[in-house]
Amino acid sequence: LKEISASIKEEFNVDCNYIAADLADSSAPEMIYNFCSENNYIVEVLVNNAGYSINKKFHETGEDEEEKFLRVLGIAVVALTKKFIPSMLEQKHGKIMMVSSLASFAPPSSGWGSLYGPIKTFVNRFGDAININYRSQGITATNVCPGFTVTEFHTASGMQDAMDKVPAFMKKDSKTVAIGAVQAMLKGKSVWVPGALNKLLAFLCNILPTSIVIKMSSSLAGGRYE
């Protein structure tokens, strides 16, 4: 974080600060909020982007692993949004990015990652709720739903072998996705799915029977869902 902060300062000639926090810790959202308040930061944009995946079958995971996972990908999203919404209401302006996934539209993968897709579906619905309740007051939430994106996510989650099976035409670079996501958020879009193929897949997931979607996903992902 220190290196990235210094790089941003140098490249863009702006002030950039940071705080290290473990969102698996229930006190982290409060700590982040207090850090911003103590530094008199007026938060106009909130990006809920923390995430990872558990590379185990559901029966192999411990309850503590699942609780931490759900806290980072779900509870912390709600808690941080809850903390910063009041000041956005005072400003009558605010942008919130919910970094979700194309997996939020599809059935969970067979045996693996049984919680990832479902929690991302929750994030989408939560983003929808923010829009329904606060768009008229100047606050918008954008559900960003990327497909396979080249980042350190899969390596960190012990899933790089699975990622390597995915055809190159289905992968997008992280910079392209990040730029598109920010543009969509600033425009106040409710949902943004990068790329024509991913948009088609999201559409098909909503209209095709679940059994067909599972087979289609497995085929396109090089057996990742088998």
Explain the meaning of each model-derived region.
Residues S101:
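Residue(s) in the substrate-gating loop at a strand-loop-helix junction
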Residues E10-S26:
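Rossmann-fold cofactor-recognition segment
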Residues K57-H59, E65-F69:
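Substrate-binding pocket helix/loop in short-chain dehydrogenase/reductase
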Residues T81, I119:
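Active-site helix of classical SDR
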Residues N143, D164-L201:
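C-terminal helical subdomain
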Residues E11, A106, D128-T140:
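Active-site-adjacent segment of SDR/Rossmann-fold oxidoreductases
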Residues N49-I54:
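Conserved NAD(P)H cofactor-binding loop of Rossmann-fold oxidoreductase domains
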